[in-house]
Amino acid sequence: MVLSAEEKALVVGLCGKISGHCDALGGEALDRLFASFGQTRTYFSHFDLSPGSADVKRHGGKVLSAIGEAAKHIDSMDQALSKLSDLHAYNLRVDPGNFQLLSHCIQAVLAAHFPADFTPQCQAAWDKFLAAVSAVLTSKYR
């Protein structure tokens, strides 16, 4: 999936605002995921899944940090996310459909926290970007 220069700028620009708040925002996205799509909890049976828990915030921070890395290497995401792709495909065996569910939750959190920045154009860019990240993470499932 090719993002235009404008779309890349929108993604990278918002990533700059997210970077200092990865745990809180990522945790909120996971809280939304677990509340809305209960089947996703099965991958985290070893976590305290109560809303706002340290486990959820810590993992949410890892998720948003990885997304930040993908944004930094937006033209070479395959290489930047290769180890993460291996982990999800070979070890964790996460259902690929869950990435799309999480993408929606991430966008809801971004819209709630950055309403002035998360314009329709920005949302479209983020939707496209997160679909590309999901495609990379599921590319080794075959």
UniProtKB/Swiss-Prot annotation:
Involved in oxygen transport from the lung to the various peripheral tissues. PANTHER family: HEMOGLOBIN FAMILY MEMBER, HEMOGLOBIN SUBUNIT ZETA. Residues 2-142 form the Globin domain. O2 binds at residue 59. It comes from the Eukaryota. Belongs to the globin family. Transmembrane segments: none annotated. Heme b binds at residue 88. It comes from Pleurodeles waltl (Iberian ribbed newt). Red blood cells. Heterotetramer of two alpha chains and two beta chains. InterPro entries: Globin (IPR000971), Globin-like_sf (IPR009050), Globin/Proto (IPR012292), Hemoglobin_a-typ (IPR002338), Hemoglobin_oxygen_transport (IPR050056), Hemoglobin_pi (IPR002339). This is Hemoglobin larval subunit alpha. Keywords: Heme, Iron, Metal-binding, Oxygen transport, Transport. One of its GO terms (cellular component) is blood microparticle. One of its GO terms (biological process) is hydrogen peroxide catabolic process. The keyword Transport applies. One of its GO terms (molecular function) is haptoglobin binding. It holds the Pfam family Globin.
